[in-house]
């Protein structure tokens, strides 16, 4: 189904924006969700990441808000700052030919005063993390009396992160709401509870990832040890000449430690975790997107919602305890119909867990890259003068 087929119910400026963004055919979630939201139905949509959910709820919201009113009419809740920023940017792109539409994004880690000024200046759409939205509500910085549409994006993750109480309070404050839509990778007990309490005759949508639409990601499972782990990581990155790599660790401590170790080896690296200020996080992400950083080491929560194209490889330095975290991690590579590669490091005691992940991703074998000969000799690093070499190192094994 083509976006132009929505012309009878969607503003022409939005159709024009989809064309400018290079969109032609709608994804399955967009075909199913857009008509329901345009009709004002409550909805629970189960769909994996990367299926076009932002456009699925963005088009109906932009079509229904009144540009003449600068009162918030739609609120979109996101579990993380990065995802909130990404949603707001996507909505701005969809609204690029609607100059009267104002979108404000509010999240923790940034100053309240600036966000309050933006809210008081007026907008039709607010994208927010739950805690920060409640902060503004308590400070009387936002008028929610005109909000008719509420969207919970990544609802399962948001409620699992401890925002259940905040989400309930937010919905309770919006007395004039007409529709509540939840988009979620899984339908957890908490998601169902919110549905039972606040939705009426909700439409349910399930979108399964199609085999042919899944990214082509070659997955390597590497048995290693604590003593050899760093050496193995360095050999992979150098041997493959990767220019943009994401490395995932389980904890903030491991993330910072690994980033320091890689930096001492001469790699262009930084880390992303929950203890950083929003300004620091934004700068790190900008450096990574612009190519000034070759390696980004991150925790799962800190990396949630990050959208970076052309990630050459994802390396799971620690085995994730959650299946969803693994699929979200490796989904950072192999985007835009490009082939990707991921590596999972594990110790012998974790082999059973790795086999579970293999079944999850329909892999059948534990495989190590045949093009590497891990001899675990000491790494010697030399600085190179060639500024075009982003790693700035030379290694001998």
What are these regions (language model features)?
Residues 379-397:
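Non-catalytic terminal extensions of ATP-dependent helicases
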Residues 2-383:
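Conserved helicase RecA-like core
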């Amino acid at each position: 189904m083509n976006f132009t087929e929505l012309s009878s119910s969607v503003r022409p400026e939005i159709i024009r924006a989809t064309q400018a963004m290079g969109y032609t055919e709608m994804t399955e979630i967009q075909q199913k969700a857009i008509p329901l939201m345009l009709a004002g139905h409550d909805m629970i949509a189960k769909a994996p990441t990367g299926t076009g959910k932002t456009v699925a709820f963005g088009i109906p919201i932009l079509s229904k808000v009144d540009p003449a009113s600068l009162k918030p009419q739609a609120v979109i809740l996101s579990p993380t700052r990065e995802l909130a920023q990404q949603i707001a940017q996507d909505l701005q792109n969809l609204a690029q030919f609607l100059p009267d539409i104002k979108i404000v994004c509010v999240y923790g880690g940034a100053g309240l005063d600036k966000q309050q000024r933006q809210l008081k200046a007026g907008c039709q759409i607010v994208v927010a993390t739950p805690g920060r939205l409640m902060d503004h509500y308590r400070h009387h910085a936002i008028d929610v009396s005109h909000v008719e549409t509420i969207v919970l994006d990544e609802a399962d993750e948001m409620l699992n992160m401890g925002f259940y109480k905040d989400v309930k309070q937010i919905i309770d404050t919006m007395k004039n709401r007409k529709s509540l839509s939840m988009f979620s990778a899984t339908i957890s007990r908490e998601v169902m509870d919110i549905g039972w309490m606040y939705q009426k005759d909700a439409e349910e949508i399930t979108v399964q990832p199609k085999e042919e639409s899944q990214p082509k990601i070659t997955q390597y499972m590497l048995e290693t040890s604590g003593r050899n782990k760093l050496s193995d990581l360095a050999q992979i990155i150098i041997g493959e000449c990767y220019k943009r790599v994401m490395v995932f660790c389980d904890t903030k401590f491991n993330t910072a430690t690994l980033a320091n170790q890689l930096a001492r080896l001469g790699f262009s690296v930084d880390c992303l975790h929950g203890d950083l200020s929003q300004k620091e996080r934004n700068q790190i992400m900008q450096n990574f997107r612009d190519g000034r950083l070759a390696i980004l080491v991150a925790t799962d929560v800190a990396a949630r919602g990050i959208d970076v194209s052309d990630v050459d490889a994802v390396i799971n330095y620690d085995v994730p305890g959650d299946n969803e975290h693994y699929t979200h991690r490796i989904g950072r590579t192999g985007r835009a119909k490009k082939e990707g590669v991921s590596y999972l490091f594990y110790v012998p005691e974790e082999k059973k867990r790795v086999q579970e992940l293999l079944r999850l991703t329909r892999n059948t074998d534990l495989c190590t890259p045949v093009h590497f000969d891990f001899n675990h000799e000491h790494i010697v690093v030399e600085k190179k003068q060639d500024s075009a070499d982003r790693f700035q190192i030379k290694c001998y094994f």
